[in-house]
């Protein structure tokens, strides 16, 4: 084997496996092991029983192995078995081992034919075994049996993949010799996960059950369907032998006799059979462990580092310590206060790049949402002028007024200021909602203490609700203050003279038709959504919105204008998204029931996000295009009945000038009021609600928690947190133990190198019969060495013996035998050796290569 260090490698992995199986982490750790895969009834369990020399595995029809069995063989002077789930109990009767495997399988999978990926760990001590670790996996099947689910094939495949996809897992691919080897389930799955063949070892069973006149010599010599690590043949007990209780020792003797007496296998007898397979697996697993140990150590160290910081908090953890609970309570409250302040005020560390924080959202409410709500509440132009005209006429009464009454201005302004209450209250509600959401996010770190989290959220949320009432009262007070006194001496107010002058200028502008340059309100890309497919479908254009019109161009260079639409008599309405559409849509329509664009009653415009839609709506509001209201039609019918439109058209010039003057005064004063409200609203909310809540959390939250009752109840851990802490501590100690185990082993050993690559393209060829030797059944011609004609049927190879000195490790390609008369008169004619023209001849690696004039026995890929 090499030295003592090498002999200790497999027991080392067994100790690692036990350490991690005890905490349920064995499936996640990539420990070196050998996975036994194969089709149903391929003989996997029989191979394992031959290793142990005892009957201990369940047998029967259908799927017998329904859970992975991690079988750890340990060379010992005494013979007994141990289960990891039955610690301390030694099984000396292997019939009891079989019953325990069946009982443990049924405990997890039930009594039907279901399967489970949870492994059973069995360790067998015996003087007849070599140190070895194997995993017996369920046989691959395609048809459900009994109560099995219809997808049993995929369930088994998924389970196999959990083991064989790991880089540290050797694959023992078991295939029966009496079936088509090219269609072997084991070789197919091995090729899928190990395309280079570095981890696959082939085992051929049922050699004694092949059809008469056929053999598997070419396969066992690794000529047909070659594997990098080669094939080993075994002969298991037949069902008759098992029923007759044939001793495994006698079965191994019969296996030896079979290989020595069979004319096709006698030259390979020393490299066939269960004992040889044990030695090969022991050597290859040992070498594999030695090669993978450094990587395993690095992986364990990285896992240890990743959990070390969290485990430090748990090492000295005492759940029932009152001092610990008090300290934890203070830390939780302090952390909650700091998190709340950072989310509101902002911070330079731990910046969230996925979503806006509470402070950023509140800022957006103050400076985007609230101004937009104010703009939405602005007056309708026609309605306002009508109200002003009614106010002027009602003030004059029966008299004919000579001057513009200021009471009409005051009455109109008060009505408009009163409308500001609704958006102001809505602003407070939106801020309260964001504060409550921020409190919930800050309390997420308290999930290990569910009672504390619940109580803390309740206290802070109750305080926010109390401050909400005070804040709304103050906001209403601000609006009432604006209503109490009209400050017409404000420095920004245009005054009566300026309003009259502006009215005259507007009249002149209407008559002259000369307009100054119109201010652009907004530019941007929009998609016209309701153009039919026959007319080109939806298209994106560059839109320019001014106070007078809406224009759109082919692109943002604004050279090719497509259309210009006047904003007079336009209104906005929302449009539901289409079933397959991801865009957000709104529409423009004409209030006078006219086509708004060509032959379309409405112009549907689409944006990528709802935020863009809201922004465009705010821009249209500035241009005098207002959203559609539910009562628009009723108001229109009332207007027609009252004849107000005709009244406005027939308004005398003096009244029209007075209305325009009051209109300008109202516009100027409302601009001042809106500016004041937009400025004072954020300040009021910040002072009365946000800053007050922050101060409450820092100074009064802890006192409120202490007054709630028993602090021990508050600091009770959640069951999930306690379980996580225990799992982390177990994982930490298991990793420490594993690294300690690895550190005790000396791996400075010399091992057999990996056999050279072989031509493994045969798996792409379908329906190649296994076990039939003929010139057409040789490996595919894509070789890296000269082609070798196969021996004729019935011919005997050279007597077994040591290979010639100087032969390369893994065996050079066999040299063709000398042509001559065939001892079989019914065999094929002799073949003349020739060099194939598909590849250059192989170059000998050593000077001592065997002469082609002498037949040579092929070397195995293993050096024992």
Swiss-Prot record:
Chain positions with Omega-N-methylarginine modification: 796
Organism listed in the record: Rattus norvegicus (Rat)
Compositionally biased tracts (Pro residues): 825-843
Gene: Dnm1
EC nos: 3.6.5.5
Consequence of substituting residue 778 to A: Does not affect phosphorylation by CDK5. Significantly reduces phosphorylation by CDK5
Subcellular location, record wording: Cell membrane; Membrane, Clathrin-coated pit; Cytoplasmic vesicle; Presynapse
Stretches for region G2 motif: 64-66
Keyword annotations of the record: Cell membrane, Cell projection, Coated pit, Cytoplasmic vesicle, Endocytosis, Golgi apparatus, GTP-binding, Hydrolase, Membrane, Methylation, Microtubule, Motor protein, Nitration, Nucleotide-binding, Phosphoprotein, Synapse
Gene3D superfamilies: Dynamin, middle domain, P-loop containing nucleotide triphosphate hydrolases, Pleckstrin-homology domain (PH domain)/Phosphotyrosine-binding domain (PTB)
Region ranges (Disordered): 767-864
Positions of region (G1 motif): 38-45
Name of the featured protein: Dynamin-1
Effect of residue 59 to K: Decreases of 67% the basal GTPase activity. Decreases of 80% the assembly-stimulated GTPase activity
Binding residue positions for GDP: 41, 43-46, 59-60, 206, 208, 211, 236-237, 239
Functional description taken from the UniProt entry: Catalyzes the hydrolysis of GTP and utilizes this energy to mediate vesicle scission and participates in many forms of endocytosis, such as clathrin-mediated endocytosis or synaptic vesicle endocytosis as well as rapid endocytosis (RE). Associates to the membrane, through lipid binding, and self-assembles into rings and stacks of interconnected rings through oligomerization to form a helical polymer around the vesicle membrane leading to constriction of invaginated coated pits around their necks.
Assembly mode: Homodimer; homodimerization is mediated by the dynamin-type G domain which promotes assembly-stimulated GTPase activity. Homo-tetramer formed from two dimers in the absence of lipid. Oligomerizes into a helical polymer that self-assembles around the vesicle membrane, when associated to the menbrane through lipid binding.
Lineage of the species this protein comes from: Eukaryota, Metazoa, Chordata, Craniata, Vertebrata
A GO cellular component entry from the record: chromaffin granule
Organ and tissue specificity: Brain-specific (peripheral sensory neurons).
Signal peptide residues on this chain, from the entry's feature table: none
Gene Ontology terms: biological process: clathrin coat assembly involved in endocytosis; endocytosis; endosome organization; G protein-coupled receptor internalization; modulation of chemical synaptic transmission; positive regulation of synaptic vesicle endocytosis; positive regulation of synaptic vesicle recycling; protein homooligomerization
């Amino acid at each position: 084997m090499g030295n003592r260090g090498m002999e200790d490698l497999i027991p080392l992995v067994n100790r690692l496996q036990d350490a991690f199986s005890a905490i349920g982490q064995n499936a996640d750790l990539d420990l070196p092991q050998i996975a036994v895969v194969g089709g149903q009834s391929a003989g996997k369990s029989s191979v394992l029983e031959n290793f142990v020399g005892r009957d201990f595995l369940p047998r029967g029809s259908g799927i017998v192995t329904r859970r992975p069995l991690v079988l750890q063989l340990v060379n010992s002077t005494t013979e007994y078995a141990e289960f990891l789930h039955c610690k301390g109990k030694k099984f000396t009767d292997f019939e009891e081992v079989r019953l325990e495997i069946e009982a443990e399988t049924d405990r997890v999978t039930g009594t039907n034919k279901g399967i489970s990926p949870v492994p059973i760990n069995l360790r067998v001590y015996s003087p007849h075994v070599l140190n070895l670790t194997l995993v017996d996996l369920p046989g691959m099947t395609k048809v459900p049996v009994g109560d099995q689910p219809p997808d049993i094939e995929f369930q088994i495949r998924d389970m196999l993949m959990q083991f064989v996809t790991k880089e540290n897992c050797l694959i023992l691919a078991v295939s029966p010799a009496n079936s088509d080897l090219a269609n072997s389930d084991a070789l197919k799955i091995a090729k899928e996960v190990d395309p280079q063949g570095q981890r696959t070892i082939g085992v051929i069973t049922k050699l004694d059950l092949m059809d008469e006149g056929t053999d598997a010599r070419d396969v066992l010599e690794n000529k047909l369907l070659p594997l990098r690590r080669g094939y080993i043949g075994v002969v298991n007990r037949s069902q008759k032998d098992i029923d007759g209780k044939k001793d495994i020792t006698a079965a191994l003797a019969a296996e030896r006799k079979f290989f020595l007496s069979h004319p096709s296998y006698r030259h390979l007898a020393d490299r066939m059979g269960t004992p040889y397979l044990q030695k090969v697996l022991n050597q290859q697993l040992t070498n594999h462990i030695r090669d993978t140990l450094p990587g395993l150590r690095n992986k364990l160290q990285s896992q240890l580092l990743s959990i070390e910081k969290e485990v430090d908090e748990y090492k000295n953890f005492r759940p029932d310590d009152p001092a610990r609970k008090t300290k934890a309570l203070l830390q939780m409250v302090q952390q909650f206060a700091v998190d709340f302040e950072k989310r509101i005020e902002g911070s330079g560390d731990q910046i969230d790049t996925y979503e806006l924080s509470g402070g950023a959202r509140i800022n957006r409410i103050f400076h985007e949402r609230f101004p937009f709500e104010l703009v939405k509440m602005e007056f309708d132009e026609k309605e306002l002028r009508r109200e002003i005209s009614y106010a002027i006429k009602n003030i004059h009464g029966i008299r004919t007024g000579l001057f513009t009454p200021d009471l009409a201005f005051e009455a109109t302004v008060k009505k408009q200021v009163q409308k500001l209450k609704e958006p102001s209250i809505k602003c407070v509600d939106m801020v309260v909602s964001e504060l409550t959401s921020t409190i919930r996010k800050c309390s997420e770190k308290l999930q290990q203490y569910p009672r504390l989290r619940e109580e803390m959220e309740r206290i802070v949320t109750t305080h926010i609700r109390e401050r909400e009432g005070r804040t709304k009262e103050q906001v209403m007070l601000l609006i009432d203050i604006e209503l109490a006194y009209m400050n017409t001496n404000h420095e920004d107010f245009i005054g009566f003279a300026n309003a009259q002058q502006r009215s005259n200028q507007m009249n002149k502008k209407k008559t002259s038709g000369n307009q100054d340059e119109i201010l652009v309100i907004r530019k941007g890309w929009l998609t016209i959504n309701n153009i039919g497919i026959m007319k080109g479908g939806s298209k994106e254009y560059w839109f320019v919105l001014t106070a007078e019109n809406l224009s759109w161009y082919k692109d943002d260079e604004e050279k090719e204008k497509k259309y210009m639409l006047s904003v007079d008599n336009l209104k906005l309405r929302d449009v539901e998204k289409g079933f397959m559409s991801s865009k957000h849509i709104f529409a423009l329509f004409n209030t006078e029931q006219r086509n708004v664009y060509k032959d379309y009653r409405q112009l549907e415009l689409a944006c990528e996000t709802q935020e863009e839609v809201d922004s465009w709506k705010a821009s249209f509001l500035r241009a005098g295009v207002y959203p559609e209201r539910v009562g628009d039609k009723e108001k229109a019918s009332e207007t027609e009945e009252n004849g107000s439109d005709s009244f406005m058209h027939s308004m005398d010039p003096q009244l029209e000038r007075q209305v325009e003057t009051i209109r300008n005064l109202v516009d100027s004063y409302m601009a001042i009021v809106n500016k004041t409200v937009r400025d004072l609203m954020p300040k009021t909310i910040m002072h009365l609600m946000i800053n007050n809540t922050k101060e409450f959390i820092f100074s009064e939250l802890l006192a409120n928690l202490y007054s709630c009752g028993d602090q021990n109840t508050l600091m009770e851990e959640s069951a999930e947190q306690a379980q996580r802490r225990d799992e982390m501590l177990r994982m930490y100690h298991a990793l420490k133990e594993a690294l300690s185990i690895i550190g005790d082993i000396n791996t400075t050993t010399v091992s057999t190198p990996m056999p050279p690559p072989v031509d493994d393209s045969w798996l792409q060829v379908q329906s190649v019969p296994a076990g039939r030797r003929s010139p057409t059944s040789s490996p595919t011609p894509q070789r890296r060495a000269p082609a070798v004609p196969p021996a004729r049927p019935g011919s005997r190879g050279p007597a077994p013996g040591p290979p010639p000195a100087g032969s390369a490790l893994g065996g050079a390609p066999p040299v063709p035998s000398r042509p001559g008369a065939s001892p079989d008169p019914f065999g094929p004619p002799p073949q003349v050796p020739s060099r194939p023209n598909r590849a250059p001849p192989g170059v000998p690696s050593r000077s001592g290569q065997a002469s082609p004039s002498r037949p040579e026995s092929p070397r195995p890929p293993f050096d024992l």
